[in-house]
């Protein structure tokens, strides 16, 4: 689940030396490692693109991400209750001073947001072959390709799809080949495992 927030102030000042609009921290997303909150990650949409934010000089759009399961206690919370909880966590993390800094919010529940690599996943190539027979279907992003891609790779699949549409290219292998280079992925080799006594 994600809570999108438009806030008037962000307490985290940019001390990196990297220039940002409004001198906000330059990160796109930050993983939260604080056991006192349930938030898993927050995003700063201003840093994705300044065109996503109407008033760059005075506001920051953030997304607070929570990892939960469809139908569980968090998933079924009323939007206002979920927002209050998340905003309290922003105060706890000192991202904002007080709840009144929040101008607006939007709750988004994304079903099956993460790809699952079990059951019949070993037959994904058969599915891809079939999907590629549908001329005007371009499978992009995490859910479209059922892959655990980062946002840059997910956006890359969209860019490739647009290139194909504009050029009339019918072979979709370039779209499916985004993020298939193995050196990027975490190693699963036993030689890299650490033995613990």
Label each PLM-derived region with a short phrase.
Residues 96, 100, 168-171:
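Generic macromolecular interface patches on structured domains
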Residues 24-26, 37-51, 98-113, 117-137:
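FAD/FMN-dependent oxidoreductases across multiple families
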Residues 1-95, 173-183, 190-197:
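Mid-domain catalytic core of redox enzymes
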Residues 71-75, 112, 142-146:
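Residue-level detector of alpha-helix boundaries and kinks
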Residues 106-108, 117-197:
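C-terminal lid/capping helical subdomain adjacent to the catalytic/cofactor pocket in oxidative enzymes
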Residues 3, 78, 97, 117-121, ...:
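General structural signal for secondary-structure boundaries
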């Amino acid at each position: 689940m994600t809570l999108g927030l438009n806030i008037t102030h962000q307490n985290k000042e940019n001390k990196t030396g990297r220039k940002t609009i409004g001198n906000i921290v330059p990160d796109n997303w930050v993983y939260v490692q604080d056991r006192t909150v349930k938030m898993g990650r927050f995003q700063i949409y201003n840093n994705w693109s300044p065109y996503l934010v109407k008033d760059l000089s005075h506001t920051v759009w953030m997304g607070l991400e929570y990892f939960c399961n469809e139908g569980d206690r968090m998933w079924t919370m009323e939007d206002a209750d979920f927002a209050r909880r998340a905003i309290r966590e922003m105060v706890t993390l000192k991202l904002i001073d007080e709840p009144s800094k929040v101008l607006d919010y939007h709750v988004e529940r994304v079903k099956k947001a993460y790809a699952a690599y079990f059951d019949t996943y070993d037959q994904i190539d058969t599915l891809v072959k079939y999907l590629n027979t549908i001329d005007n279907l371009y499978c992009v992003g995490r859910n479209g390709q059922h892959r655990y891609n980062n946002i840059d790779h997910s956006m890359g699949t969209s860019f490739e799809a647009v290139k194909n549409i504009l050029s009339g290219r019918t072979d979709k292998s370039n779209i499916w080949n985004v993020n298939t280079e193995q050196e990027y992925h975490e190693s699963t080799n036993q030689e890299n495992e650490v033995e613990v006594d």
